[in-house]
């Protein structure tokens, strides 16, 4: 099972120029399921992405989009989505209770017939108290589910070692940390944010539960335009993770 996540920066920061970079790298990556955050709801940004990916792949990659807008008026502008090439059995969403943020869950059917839960989230800006509260809501939501292999992915707006990451790590594992012994050097900002200062931060994660083995993990969507080093798919790098469900006792 190959998963990816990317904050796509809605249609800001040279979207019309960078969108082909995003689509090309998505074709090359070809995840089974991908979470996206900061998605423009109107016009339909996700719709353009999946149509362009299908065109570039000559029909080989066909994704269905499962969108969830932010709550309230903010939902007219922005939301999150999961793109899936696998059959989706059910979908659900969760109000995270602050800054109009939401999380979503899609349950996919694996080629072998098993079910797999994918949680996609974009946690709020501001303090760790806010984000820890949102993370706790997601964890409680996950615990209420039947025991299925599950991942939580997205832009969590928090750094390694933060209270939010520590909370999540009590019951989940960071895929990148598990494979490499550390998180990436950074996931944001990329060269697209030309005026950003500092060394950047890790804000994006893929967490897995104990019913999954992590086979590989790394950053993704790193390629810049060969003629313009400041033009890149987004202001975040993405993550790419390959996992295998652990055998279960009959």
Short names for language-model regions:
Residues 2-8, 22-46, 83, 106, ...:
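Active-site beta-strand/loop signature of hydrolases that rely on acidic residues for catalysis
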Residues 107, 143-150, 158-250:
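Metal-dependent phosphoester-hydrolase catalytic domains
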Residues 11-13, 41-44, 100, 126-129, ...:
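Active-site environment of divalent metal-dependent phosphoester hydrolases
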């Amino acid at each position: 099972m190959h998963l990816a996540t990317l904050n796509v920066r809605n249609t800001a920061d040279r979207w019309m120029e960078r969108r082909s970079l995003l689509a090309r790298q998505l074709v090359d990556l070809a995840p089974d399921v991908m979470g996206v955050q900061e998605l423009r709801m109107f016009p339909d940004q996700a719709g353009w992405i999946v149509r362009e990916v299908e065109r570039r792949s000559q029909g080989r990659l066909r994704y269905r989009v499962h969108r969830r807008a932010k709550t309230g008026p903010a939902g007219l502008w922005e939301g999150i989505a999961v793109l899936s090439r696998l059959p989706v059995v059910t979908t659900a969403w969760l109000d995270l209770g602050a800054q109009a943020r939401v999380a979503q869950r899609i349950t996919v059917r694996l080629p072998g017939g098993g079910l797999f839960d994918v949680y996609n989230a974009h946690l709020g800006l501001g303090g760790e108290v806010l984000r820890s509260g949102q993370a706790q809501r997601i964890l409680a939501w996950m615990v209420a589910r039947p025991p299925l292999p599950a991942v939580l992915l997205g832009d969590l707006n928090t750094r390694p070692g933060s209270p939010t990451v520590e909370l999540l790590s009590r019951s989940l594992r960071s895929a990148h940390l598990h494979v490499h012994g550390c998180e990436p050097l950074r996931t944001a900002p990329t060269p697209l944010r030309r005026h950003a200062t500092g060394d950047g931060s890790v804000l994006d994660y893929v967490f897995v539960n104990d019913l999954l083995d992590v086979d590989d993990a790394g950053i993704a969507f790193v390629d810049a335009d060969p003629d313009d080093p400041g033009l890149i798919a987004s202001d975040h790098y993405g993550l790419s993770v390959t996992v295998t469900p652990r055998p279960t006792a009959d």
